Amino acid sequence: MKQNITVVSLGPGDPELLTAQSLNTMKKAKRLIFRTAQHPVYAVLTEAGVQSTSLDDYYDRYEDFDEMHRDMAKALWTEAEHHAVVFAVLDAGTDGAVRELRAQQPQDAVLRILPGVTLADACIAQLPGNLAPIGALRTIPAEDA
């Protein structure tokens, strides 16, 4: 079986900001894995009867985020040897585990990343027009700062 992972960006927390494409992908997933269950979309999908797991236990096992991200990606690619995987994260564009998925991607494997509303998008939308840094904003994950 060709390894296949689809990454879904969950967004800043409001389930209504989730894209229809991402929601449908998660509902149809045979193997849905959340980076963390500490996201409102996890609760909404669980209440709707969608089966999933999370990688929350990694946070207790690791002190080094780089090592944690490497091992998350390794575990996801291993799981993808048996099932197509949907991996749900806050923001695929800034997530360290997603960066590692790209770095570790086997030659014949498929890695698909679905876009979503970012935390920065949600914050900027709340700013008054004269303060919104349209085109002049650079986001850096705290772990990289």
Label the model's feature ranges:
Residues 1-15, 20-114, 122:
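Class I S-adenosyl-L-methionine
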Residues 102-127, 132-142:
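Short, acidic/small-residue loops that bind anionic groups at enzyme active sites
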Residues 66-69, 138-145:
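A general structural motif
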